[in-house]
Amino acid sequence: MDELLRLIGLWDDRHAGLAGYSKGMRQKILLLASLLHDPELLILDEPFSGLDVNAAMILRSLLHSLAARQKMILYSSHVLEVVEKVAHTVLILRKGRVVAHDSVARLREVMSESSLEGVFTQLTNPEDTDAIAHRILDVVAA
């Protein structure tokens, strides 16, 4: 465990209580703990949340390495740019229902989109986000 704490930059803070850690520091500890028993299935909820850029890059590489070792990784994320770089297969939900389940490349091809965000927009038909943003600014300025 000592070596793991050094690798993720928490060695100097190893004696601090978990409550004293930042969200990103807690996230690193929880991710390490989830790997300790070498699970075949790893379930992560928003694993990139709260991580600094370097830690997120390490996690992305770690997830790729785990997948290469035939580990199944199931994780939720609202950050589509990260999902696009990490996930082999995605499941897109709209109001609790599955609207797509395929590889990122296949979804982009079928939907004629260059990004996962474009696929998501087509499949979920979200509200006009630009109009909402402008309305918020109008209300705040008033």
Predicted feature residues:
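Helical segment within the ABC ATPase nucleotide-binding domain
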Residues: 57-69
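A short, proline-enriched helix->beta-strand linker immediately N-terminal to the Walker B motif
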Residues: 36-40
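A short, surface-exposed alpha-helical micro-motif characterized by mixed small hydrophobic
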Residues: 83-84
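Catalytic Walker B motif of ABC-type/P-loop ATPase nucleotide-binding domains
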Residues: 42-45
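Helix N-cap at the start of a conserved alpha-helix in ABC-type nucleotide-binding domains
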Residues: 53-55
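ABC ATPase "signature
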Residues: 101-102
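Conserved ABC ATPase "signature" region
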Residues: 1-13
